[in-house]
Amino acid sequence: MNYYTQKNNAGSLNISENVFVQIANDSLSELMKEELKNIVFLKNVNKQAKTHCEIDKKNHIKVDVEVYLSADCEAGKISTKIQKEIYDDIYDATEISAVKVNVIILGFISKK
């Protein structure tokens, strides 16, 4: 497990990768309840989508969010919306701006 570390005179702040995953998952859940309901999915018949976070030794944070999308949606527009919401929520919670959020589309789901 890696941590984002920020040192100051009083000590250090260490934020676990799990915190960034939790924020991303919470953001995605909210979007799926409201704006992106029936457009974004976290599972298909065979696979569950996951969220990953990596923090390297230089304190660079990368959050990868896997999703399935409805086949009839605008994938670029939807993935940009997801990316922006997650980035904004991470910034609001941590005040860290050096975060990359990657949306990985695992597939498309046809509505029946």
Locate each region found by the language model.
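Conserved NTP-handling cores and scaffolds of large molecular machines
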Residues: 31-35, 94, 112
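Short edge beta-strands and adjacent turn/loop segments
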Residues: 36-68, 103-107
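N-proximal, solvent-exposed amphipathic alpha-helical segments enriched in charged/polar residues
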Residues: 5-52
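Protein-protein interaction and targeting regions used for scaffolding, dimerization, and localization
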Residues: 13, 67-68, 76
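Short, non-transmembrane amphipathic alpha-helical segments
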Residues: 74-94
